[in-house]
């Protein structure tokens, strides 16, 4: 990446999901598992990148969905059912788990070489949704630990991020041409 390039000529493979061989431990994915991390808000993307990358700039681009996806929304948690509603009382434990887990997702984790331990609970739940859930889940939405914005993680590696005209059966996201930018942080 060149520092002076305000509109670089990136391709989906170079700015989408990190290849598995280079994928480090992240909030939702263990080292070696590639996933697409994004946000609809550039400020949130910059806040997330700034937390672990010391460079004074960041490369960003817009992607669009090629097909509908199903995501588990942990960014907006349900209200606790009333203790006086016998029809919904059985949901209390589940709702409390979702609310507690969502709060855990929003806690900062120190990048001290032991982050893989702090990330383990969220990675386990992500792997459940990705591989074992009877639901057909493509990703998760969650709140940024850095600015409260909405983040998305989609369960796809570089093969799921394509350039216009490069659509494949595995593709989920298409790079919007001309949207690539290098921004100061």
Give residue ranges: language-model regions.
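Active-site and NAD+-binding cores of ADP-ribose-processing enzymes
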Residues: 1-29, 52-185
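A short, exposed loop/beta-hairpin motif centered on an aromatic-Gly-Thr core
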Residues: 32-38
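Conserved structured core elements
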Residues: 39-43, 119
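Short active-site loop/helix that positions an aromatic residue
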Residues: 42-53
């Amino acid at each position: 990446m060149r520092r002076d390039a305000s509109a670089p000529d990136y391709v989906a493979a170079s700015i989408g999901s990190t290849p598995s061989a280079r994928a480090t431990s992240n909030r939702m994915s263990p080292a070696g598992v590639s996933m697409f991390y994004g946000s609809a808000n550039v400020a949130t993307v910059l806040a997330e990148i700034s937390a672990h990358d010391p460079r004074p700039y960041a490369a960003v681009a817009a992607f669009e969905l090629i097909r509908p996806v199903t995501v588990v929304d942990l960014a907006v948690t349900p209200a606790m059912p009333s203790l006086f509603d016998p029809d919904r009382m059985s949901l209390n434990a589940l709702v409390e788990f979702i609310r507690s887990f969502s709060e855990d997702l929003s806690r900062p984790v120190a990048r001290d070489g032991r982050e893989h331990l702090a990330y383990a609970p969220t990675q386990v739940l992500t792997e459940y949704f990705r591989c074992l859930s009877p639901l057909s889940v493509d990703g998760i939405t969650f709140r940024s630990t850095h600015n409260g914005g909405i983040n998305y993680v989609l369960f796809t590696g570089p093969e799921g991020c394509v350039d216009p005209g490069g659509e494949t059966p595995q593709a989920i996201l298409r790079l919007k041409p001309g949207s690539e930018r290098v921004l100061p942080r």
